[in-house]
Protein backbone atom coordinates (compact mmCIF):
# COMPACT_ATOMS: atom_id res chain seq x y z
CA UNK A 1 0.00 0.00 0.00
CA UNK A 2 1.34 3.46 -0.86
CA UNK A 3 2.02 5.93 1.91
CA UNK A 4 -1.32 7.50 2.65
CA UNK A 5 -1.73 11.15 1.91
CA UNK A 6 -3.85 13.67 3.74
CA UNK A 7 -5.87 14.31 0.59
CA UNK A 8 -6.90 10.62 0.51
CA UNK A 9 -9.18 11.47 3.46
CA UNK A 10 -10.97 14.39 1.84
CA UNK A 11 -14.71 14.21 1.19
CA UNK A 12 -17.18 16.91 0.10
CA UNK A 13 -19.55 17.99 2.85
CA UNK A 14 -22.35 20.50 2.24
CA UNK A 15 -22.24 23.12 5.02
CA UNK A 16 -25.89 22.52 5.94
CA UNK A 17 -25.04 18.98 7.12
CA UNK A 18 -22.86 20.34 9.95
CA UNK A 19 -25.09 20.00 13.02
CA UNK A 20 -25.41 23.28 14.95
CA UNK A 21 -27.25 21.83 17.93
CA UNK A 22 -27.64 18.39 19.47
CA UNK A 23 -30.56 16.07 18.73
CA UNK A 24 -33.37 16.33 21.26
CA UNK A 25 -33.92 13.95 22.92
CA UNK A 26 -30.28 12.88 22.78
CA UNK A 27 -30.97 9.31 21.66
CA UNK A 28 -33.13 10.42 18.72
CA UNK A 29 -29.98 11.02 16.63
CA UNK A 30 -29.55 8.69 13.68
CA UNK A 31 -27.21 5.70 13.83
CA UNK A 32 -25.41 4.26 10.81
CA UNK A 33 -24.57 0.62 11.56
CA UNK A 34 -21.56 -0.79 9.70
CA UNK A 35 -20.87 -4.53 9.76
CA UNK A 36 -17.24 -5.68 9.61
CA UNK A 37 -18.53 -9.18 8.76
CA UNK A 38 -20.61 -8.56 5.64
CA UNK A 39 -19.94 -4.87 4.83
CA UNK A 40 -23.67 -4.07 5.15
CA UNK A 41 -24.86 -0.56 6.02
CA UNK A 42 -28.04 -0.14 8.08
CA UNK A 43 -29.79 3.13 8.92
CA UNK A 44 -31.18 3.18 12.47
CA UNK A 45 -31.87 5.53 15.38
CA UNK A 46 -29.40 5.77 18.29
CA UNK A 47 -31.93 4.32 20.73
CA UNK A 48 -31.80 1.10 18.62
CA UNK A 49 -28.21 0.56 19.82
CA UNK A 50 -29.16 -2.21 22.32
CA UNK A 51 -30.49 -4.33 19.41
CA UNK A 52 -26.91 -4.68 18.16
CA UNK A 53 -25.37 -5.56 21.52
CA UNK A 54 -25.13 -9.03 23.04
CA UNK A 55 -25.16 -10.11 26.70
CA UNK A 56 -21.55 -10.14 27.90
CA UNK A 57 -20.46 -7.24 25.67
CA UNK A 58 -18.76 -4.33 27.42
CA UNK A 59 -19.18 -0.68 26.39
CA UNK A 60 -16.27 1.51 27.48
CA UNK A 61 -17.16 5.20 27.89
CA UNK A 62 -14.99 8.24 28.62
CA UNK A 63 -16.21 9.96 31.81
CA UNK A 64 -14.18 13.12 31.26
CA UNK A 65 -16.08 16.34 31.88
CA UNK A 66 -15.65 19.48 29.78
CA UNK A 67 -14.35 22.55 31.58
CA UNK A 68 -16.26 25.75 30.79
CA UNK A 69 -12.76 26.85 29.85
CA UNK A 70 -13.42 29.93 27.69
CA UNK A 71 -13.27 33.07 29.78
CA UNK A 72 -13.54 36.63 28.54
CA UNK A 73 -11.89 39.28 30.66
CA UNK A 74 -10.54 42.81 30.80
CA UNK A 75 -6.84 43.66 30.63
CA UNK A 76 -5.63 45.80 33.51
CA UNK A 77 -5.24 48.73 33.47
CA UNK A 78 -6.15 49.36 29.80
CA UNK A 79 -9.66 47.86 29.87
CA UNK A 80 -9.09 46.02 26.57
CA UNK A 81 -11.22 42.88 26.13
CA UNK A 82 -9.35 39.59 25.84
CA UNK A 83 -10.10 35.89 25.98
CA UNK A 84 -8.34 32.90 27.54
CA UNK A 85 -9.00 29.26 26.77
CA UNK A 86 -7.60 26.90 29.40
CA UNK A 87 -5.94 23.95 27.66
CA UNK A 88 -4.26 22.01 30.46
CA UNK A 89 -3.16 22.34 34.05
CA UNK A 90 0.62 22.80 34.26
CA UNK A 91 0.92 22.82 38.05
CA UNK A 92 -1.29 24.14 40.81
CA UNK A 93 -3.06 27.24 39.54
CA UNK A 94 -0.83 27.61 36.48
CA UNK A 95 -2.43 26.59 33.18
CA UNK A 96 -1.40 26.50 29.56
CA UNK A 97 -3.85 28.78 27.73
CA UNK A 98 -4.66 29.94 24.25
CA UNK A 99 -4.85 33.74 24.47
CA UNK A 100 -6.64 36.18 22.15
CA UNK A 101 -5.29 38.64 21.12
CA UNK A 102 -2.07 36.72 21.86
CA UNK A 103 0.35 39.40 20.66
CA UNK A 104 -1.08 41.91 23.13
CA UNK A 105 -0.80 39.56 26.11
CA UNK A 106 2.86 39.81 26.99
CA UNK A 107 4.49 38.36 30.10
CA UNK A 108 3.25 40.25 33.16
CA UNK A 109 -0.13 41.14 31.64
CA UNK A 110 -2.88 41.08 34.27
CA UNK A 111 -6.47 40.21 33.38
CA UNK A 112 -9.58 40.38 35.53
CA UNK A 113 -12.79 38.40 34.98
CA UNK A 114 -16.40 38.95 36.01
CA UNK A 115 -16.64 40.98 39.19
CA UNK A 116 -12.85 40.89 39.61
CA UNK A 117 -12.88 37.90 41.98
CA UNK A 118 -10.93 35.93 39.36
CA UNK A 119 -7.69 37.36 37.98
CA UNK A 120 -4.85 35.99 35.88
CA UNK A 121 -1.24 36.91 35.19
CA UNK A 122 0.69 35.83 32.07
CA UNK A 123 3.92 34.10 33.15
CA UNK A 124 5.43 32.94 29.89
CA UNK A 125 4.86 32.77 26.12
CA UNK A 126 5.57 29.39 24.50
CA UNK A 127 6.99 28.72 21.03
CA UNK A 128 3.55 28.00 19.56
CA UNK A 129 2.15 31.25 20.97
CA UNK A 130 0.29 29.61 23.87
CA UNK A 131 0.75 31.17 27.32
CA UNK A 132 1.47 29.87 30.80
CA UNK A 133 -0.97 31.77 33.02
CA UNK A 134 -1.44 31.74 36.81
CA UNK A 135 -4.95 32.27 38.20
CA UNK A 136 -5.93 33.92 41.49
CA UNK A 137 -9.42 33.51 42.99
CA UNK A 138 -11.42 33.71 46.22
CA UNK A 139 -13.12 30.30 46.08
CA UNK A 140 -12.02 26.84 47.18
CA UNK A 141 -11.20 25.80 43.59
CA UNK A 142 -10.67 27.42 40.21
CA UNK A 143 -13.43 25.18 38.82
CA UNK A 144 -16.06 27.04 40.86
CA UNK A 145 -14.95 30.29 39.21
CA UNK A 146 -15.01 28.71 35.74
CA UNK A 147 -18.54 27.51 36.41
CA UNK A 148 -19.46 31.10 37.27
CA UNK A 149 -17.68 32.98 34.45
CA UNK A 150 -16.66 30.37 31.86
CA UNK A 151 -18.30 29.19 28.65
CA UNK A 152 -18.03 25.84 26.88
CA UNK A 153 -15.26 25.91 24.27
CA UNK A 154 -17.41 24.81 21.33
CA UNK A 155 -15.63 23.72 18.14
CA UNK A 156 -15.07 26.51 15.58
CA UNK A 157 -17.64 25.08 13.14
CA UNK A 158 -20.48 25.48 15.65
CA UNK A 159 -21.72 29.04 15.37
CA UNK A 160 -24.90 28.77 17.41
CA UNK A 161 -24.85 29.47 21.16
CA UNK A 162 -25.97 26.61 23.41
CA UNK A 163 -29.28 27.02 25.21
CA UNK A 164 -27.81 25.10 28.11
CA UNK A 165 -24.13 24.36 28.88
CA UNK A 166 -25.01 20.77 29.86
CA UNK A 167 -25.90 20.02 26.22
CA UNK A 168 -22.14 19.75 25.57
CA UNK A 169 -21.65 17.30 28.46
CA UNK A 170 -22.33 13.56 28.52
CA UNK A 171 -24.84 12.38 31.14
CA UNK A 172 -22.05 10.35 32.81
CA UNK A 173 -19.37 13.09 32.78
CA UNK A 174 -17.61 13.41 36.13
CA UNK A 175 -13.82 13.91 35.86
CA UNK A 176 -13.22 17.59 35.02
CA UNK A 177 -10.46 18.33 32.54
CA UNK A 178 -11.50 18.21 28.87
CA UNK A 179 -11.29 21.11 26.43
CA UNK A 180 -13.89 19.40 24.21
CA UNK A 181 -16.63 16.83 24.79
CA UNK A 182 -16.08 13.15 23.97
CA UNK A 183 -18.98 13.56 21.56
CA UNK A 184 -20.00 9.96 20.83
CA UNK A 185 -21.24 9.85 24.42
CA UNK A 186 -23.61 12.80 23.94
CA UNK A 187 -26.22 10.41 22.46
CA UNK A 188 -26.73 8.41 25.66
CA UNK A 189 -29.60 9.06 28.07
CA UNK A 190 -29.86 7.52 31.55
CA UNK A 191 -32.84 5.46 30.29
CA UNK A 192 -30.88 4.09 27.32
CA UNK A 193 -28.03 3.12 29.66
CA UNK A 194 -30.52 1.27 31.88
CA UNK A 195 -31.86 -0.59 28.83
CA UNK A 196 -28.32 -1.57 27.83
CA UNK A 197 -27.48 -2.85 31.32
CA UNK A 198 -30.80 -4.73 31.53
CA UNK A 199 -29.73 -6.63 28.43
CA UNK A 200 -26.65 -7.96 30.23
CA UNK A 201 -24.25 -5.53 28.58
CA UNK A 202 -21.69 -3.90 30.87
CA UNK A 203 -20.70 -0.23 30.88
CA UNK A 204 -17.20 0.61 32.15
CA UNK A 205 -15.49 3.99 32.43
CA UNK A 206 -12.07 5.30 31.48
CA UNK A 207 -10.91 8.92 31.57
CA UNK A 208 -9.15 10.74 28.75
CA UNK A 209 -9.06 14.51 28.91
CA UNK A 210 -9.68 15.70 25.37
CA UNK A 211 -7.22 18.38 24.33
CA UNK A 212 -7.87 21.01 21.69
CA UNK A 213 -5.34 19.18 19.53
CA UNK A 214 -8.29 16.99 18.62
CA UNK A 215 -9.36 19.85 16.29
CA UNK A 216 -5.84 20.51 15.00
CA UNK A 217 -5.73 19.93 11.26
CA UNK A 218 -3.13 17.57 9.82
CA UNK A 219 -0.54 19.84 8.16
CA UNK A 220 1.73 17.27 6.49
CA UNK A 221 0.93 15.72 3.11
CA UNK A 222 2.10 12.27 4.22
CA UNK A 223 -0.02 11.40 7.22
CA UNK A 224 2.75 9.39 8.92
CA UNK A 225 4.66 12.68 9.31
CA UNK A 226 1.85 14.13 11.46
CA UNK A 227 2.78 14.65 15.10
CA UNK A 228 -0.15 13.85 17.39
CA UNK A 229 -1.04 15.96 20.41
CA UNK A 230 -0.65 14.41 23.85
CA UNK A 231 -3.58 13.76 26.21
CA UNK A 232 -3.85 12.52 29.80
CA UNK A 233 -5.70 9.26 30.48
CA UNK A 234 -6.49 6.96 33.37
CA UNK A 235 -7.85 3.40 33.66
CA UNK A 236 -8.98 2.08 37.05
CA UNK A 237 -8.28 -1.43 38.35
CA UNK A 238 -12.02 -2.21 38.18
CA UNK A 239 -12.30 -1.21 34.52
CA UNK A 240 -9.07 -3.01 33.56
CA UNK A 241 -10.33 -6.20 35.21
CA UNK A 242 -13.73 -5.99 33.49
CA UNK A 243 -12.06 -5.55 30.10
CA UNK A 244 -9.73 -8.53 30.70
CA UNK A 245 -12.67 -10.67 31.87
CA UNK A 246 -14.75 -9.68 28.81
CA UNK A 247 -11.92 -10.61 26.44
CA UNK A 248 -11.21 -13.88 28.28
CA UNK A 249 -14.88 -14.88 28.00
CA UNK A 250 -14.80 -14.28 24.24
CA UNK A 251 -17.12 -11.27 24.39
CA UNK A 252 -16.73 -7.90 22.66
CA UNK A 253 -15.20 -4.70 23.97
CA UNK A 254 -16.89 -1.75 22.27
CA UNK A 255 -15.38 1.71 22.69
CA UNK A 256 -17.75 4.66 22.90
CA UNK A 257 -15.84 7.39 21.12
CA UNK A 258 -12.39 7.77 19.61
CA UNK A 259 -11.09 8.96 22.99
CA UNK A 260 -12.03 5.70 24.76
CA UNK A 261 -10.63 3.83 21.77
CA UNK A 262 -7.30 5.67 21.89
CA UNK A 263 -7.02 5.12 25.64
CA UNK A 264 -7.53 1.36 25.35
CA UNK A 265 -5.33 0.96 22.28
CA UNK A 266 -2.52 3.05 23.80
CA UNK A 267 -2.46 0.90 26.94
CA UNK A 268 -2.80 -2.39 25.02
CA UNK A 269 0.08 -1.39 22.71
CA UNK A 270 2.24 -0.37 25.67
CA UNK A 271 1.68 -3.36 27.98
CA UNK A 272 0.29 -6.08 25.71
CA UNK A 273 -2.85 -6.11 27.86
CA UNK A 274 -5.21 -3.70 29.59
CA UNK A 275 -4.01 -2.84 33.07
CA UNK A 276 -4.77 -0.11 35.58
CA UNK A 277 -2.59 2.90 34.83
CA UNK A 278 -2.55 6.59 34.03
CA UNK A 279 -0.27 8.71 31.90
CA UNK A 280 -0.23 10.63 28.65
CA UNK A 281 -0.68 9.23 25.18
CA UNK A 282 -0.16 10.61 21.70
CA UNK A 283 -1.15 7.41 19.89
CA UNK A 284 -2.04 7.92 16.23
CA UNK A 285 -4.22 5.21 14.67
CA UNK A 286 -4.20 5.24 10.86
CA UNK A 287 -4.58 2.56 8.15
CA UNK A 288 -1.95 -0.14 8.64
CA UNK A 289 -1.82 0.23 12.42
CA UNK A 290 -3.08 -2.85 14.27
CA UNK A 291 -5.79 -2.71 16.93
CA UNK A 292 -5.04 -4.76 20.06
CA UNK A 293 -8.11 -4.30 22.23
CA UNK A 294 -11.38 -3.05 20.81
CA UNK A 295 -13.85 -5.10 18.77
CA UNK A 296 -16.26 -2.29 17.95
CA UNK A 297 -16.71 1.46 18.10
CA UNK A 298 -19.49 4.01 18.55
CA UNK A 299 -18.45 7.33 17.04
CA UNK A 300 -19.69 10.46 15.28
CA UNK A 301 -18.93 11.61 11.73
CA UNK A 302 -15.57 13.35 11.61
CA UNK A 303 -13.97 16.21 9.68
CA UNK A 304 -12.37 15.55 6.30
CA UNK A 305 -8.60 14.96 6.57
CA UNK A 306 -8.78 14.73 10.39
CA UNK A 307 -6.85 12.18 12.45
CA UNK A 308 -10.27 10.89 13.57
CA UNK A 309 -11.47 9.83 10.12
CA UNK A 310 -8.03 8.18 9.75
CA UNK A 311 -8.74 6.22 12.94
CA UNK A 312 -12.07 5.01 11.50
CA UNK A 313 -10.30 3.95 8.29
CA UNK A 314 -7.72 2.07 10.38
CA UNK A 315 -10.46 0.10 12.12
CA UNK A 316 -12.99 -0.43 9.34
CA UNK A 317 -10.83 -0.23 6.20
CA UNK A 318 -10.06 2.79 4.04
CA UNK A 319 -12.32 2.12 1.03
CA UNK A 320 -15.28 1.06 3.16
CA UNK A 321 -14.92 4.12 5.39
CA UNK A 322 -14.85 6.59 2.51
CA UNK A 323 -17.84 4.81 0.96
CA UNK A 324 -19.79 4.99 4.25
CA UNK A 325 -19.10 8.74 4.46
CA UNK A 326 -20.31 9.19 0.88
CA UNK A 327 -23.53 7.35 1.80
CA UNK A 328 -23.88 9.49 4.95
CA UNK A 329 -23.74 12.67 2.84
CA UNK A 330 -26.27 11.25 0.34
CA UNK A 331 -28.60 10.24 3.19
CA UNK A 332 -28.17 13.67 4.79
CA UNK A 333 -26.77 12.49 8.11
CA UNK A 334 -25.80 15.30 10.49
CA UNK A 335 -22.05 15.69 10.92
CA UNK A 336 -19.44 16.47 13.61
CA UNK A 337 -19.78 17.12 17.35
CA UNK A 338 -23.56 17.57 17.56
CA UNK A 339 -24.26 15.23 14.66
CA UNK A 340 -25.41 11.65 14.19
CA UNK A 341 -23.56 8.49 15.13
CA UNK A 342 -21.96 5.46 13.56
CA UNK A 343 -21.60 1.97 15.03
CA UNK A 344 -18.86 -0.30 13.68
CA UNK A 345 -19.19 -3.94 14.76
Describe every region a protein language model picked out.
Residues 2-345:
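Surface-exposed, charge/polar-rich loops and edge strands
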